[in-house]
Amino acid sequence: MFLINGLEQNTLAVNDRATQFGDGCFTTARVVDGRVQLLDTHLARLQSACERLAIPFERWSTLGDEMTSLAQRQQTGVLKVILSRGAGGRGYSGSACDTPTRILSTSAAPAHYARWKEEGATLALSPVPLGRNPYLAGLKHLNRLEQVLIRSHLEQTNADEALVLDSDGWLTECCAANLFWRCGQDVYTPRLDQAGVNGIMRQYIMKRLAPTAYRVVEVNAPLSALAQADEVLICNALMPVVPVQRYAEQQWSARELYRYLAPLCESPD
């Protein structure tokens, strides 16, 4: 179902800047037992994105209530929230927009993640690099053409997910997930100050590992860094964390970090 500006409907104004320019941001949350997992973190992500994009959205309490209400109706599955600058005007200027648009939708949970958790995911290198833009890096904005192309190429392989580099050749993320790899007690994840999305589960994992014996390091690393890894994981808010079993000729069977994180990520609140 769709909830647009508080009303159940599936019609959006054709001059909304979400469709005209991808002028907005979004977040995708996991719903379990009628509750939005990490609700406050999702709201904080949207608020931070709106501030950076200069979208004057102010109805945060209303949005939180709508997310909570839809989750209670959905019980289990996925809740997506989109915020756009709104409708009005023409051209790139958003000065004619005075009311941001909020769109909430629900859907079933992805079924394939259960298999990935049991067997481990397989990765393939994407030929599509991410452009480097420090102003937009980290944001889950509505401009997702890179991911559309990455996904299109991935569907031509037998892999489950894509390893994605930025235009300088640094490991950045997967198509729809963040990346971690472990070498002994050191846990590495790509820096996201130039490209990529700072995912909700990435943030949660880094927070949970901070007081442990594991040392979390954000790095600029080449693809070859994975050859030294004892273990590789991918994560997003829906998975929420999955072990990687193979990339090209490299295979990983260790599950130490995964076994530690899995129960924490399944019930993060």
Language model features with spans:
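Helix-start/capping segments and mature chain N-termini
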Residues: 1-68, 72-73, 84, 89, ...
